[in-house]
Amino acid sequence: MRVQDVGLLACPDCRGRLVWHGQSEDDRLDEGRLRCGGCGETWEVEDGLARLYREDRVRGTDRLMRHIYDGLPSLHDPLTAVLTPLFQSVSESRMRDGYMRRLELGSLKRHEDGQPVRVLEVGVGAGANLPRIRGALPPGLPVEVWGMDLSTGMLAQCEKRLRRGRGVKDTRLLVADAHALPFRDATFDRVFHVGGIGGYHQPAVALREMARVARPGTPLVVVDEQMDADFRPSLFQRAAFRALTFYTREARSPRALLPPDAEGVIEEQVSPFYYCLTFRVPGPAVTG
């Protein structure tokens, strides 16, 4: 994260502006603190990674899932690639393509004020979607990708992916909680989340936060587990789905939890086990 990026951040507690106090290297945050000009709270930055969340608010399934992801971060993506076709009879690539198209990345245009286009992935994990973002963007478009996650283990894997050139070059990573996104209102041109909201302790709050930080009119895309009503699973597939959704008895789309003013709502299955929920927040369409 660069020093000038701090202007896009907001205090997770009060949404006040943050000010950087610390060391920077090549204009990048290194070691120090982000201090809120409103409530005075400070947030640590270690090894260039901002930690903008409260540990005492990470509880229940949020804490459990973080523990799981931190324990096996290097195995997550390889297992997903192997198990998706085994469990669902559809490739991982086809499933990801099914929801990435809903982001309409190809329609993004330059901002008249010269600011880069900004894309946020809530729960970026090891960054499996980053190559697809890069491939879908219009050539030459200045874009920043922001990825946040509660798992430092997964973020470390994401950083390795970026160093290998498998993503968008201008990417920022930070540790944050989806229930209190550390960004100013209407910051991002695209916002999406894949594979975690079903385990959040307050999914409605997370949905409101995603809507808050999205620019009016932009598509927001949320993906997680839900058995396709038209799918006829085998006993093996039923057992696999139950294992994947061990954290809840009702794995389903949170459509009923969307903000009251959500519009253009589309709910669809992108694979036998995963739904894709697309919606927009009120306002004129974002064209540049």
What are these regions, as identified by a protein language model?
Residues 7, 53-113, 128-132, 136, ...:
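Conserved class I S-adenosyl-L-methionine
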Residues 179-191:
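A short acidic, Gly/Pro-enriched loop at the edge of an enzyme's catalytic core
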Residues 190-202:
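A short SAM/SAH-binding and catalytic strip from SAM-dependent methyltransferases
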Residues 221-278:
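C-terminal alpha-helical "lid/dimerization" subdomain adjacent to the S-adenosyl-L-methionine
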